[in-house]
Amino acid sequence: MLSQKPKKKHNFLNHGLSLNLVIKPYLALEGSVAFPAENGVQDTESTQEKRETGDEENSAKFPVGRRDFDTLSCMLGRVYQSCWQV
């Protein structure tokens, strides 16, 4: 009879692959991204100014129906039914 070796869990780290990758954690962001609360107030105010200064006559208006909202909420994953049922 052949002797059977105990089965090891398949793990790519055990196969000689060296991982010399330096991966920063999600919270180790640099610059203005690290503290959006400080810059967020200025961005919000400038966005609001741009919205108020737009011409109402030249702005495009599209009819939005219930089906559009259902499809959007389905894409965002905030409904309990499947996307194909929309």
From Swiss-Prot:
It holds the Pfam family Pro-MCH. One of its GO terms (cellular component) is extracellular region. One of its GO terms (biological process) is chemical synaptic transmission. Belongs to the melanin-concentrating hormone family. Residues 38-62 are annotated as: Disordered. Residues 31-49 are annotated as: NGE-like. InterPro entries: Prepro-melanin_conc_hormone. This is Putative pro-MCH-like protein 1. Residues 68-86 are annotated as: Melanin-concentrating hormone-like. It comes from the Eukaryota. Residues 52-64 are annotated as: NEI-like. One of its GO terms (molecular function) is type 1 melanin-concentrating hormone receptor binding. Disulfide bonds: none annotated. Expressed in testis and brain.
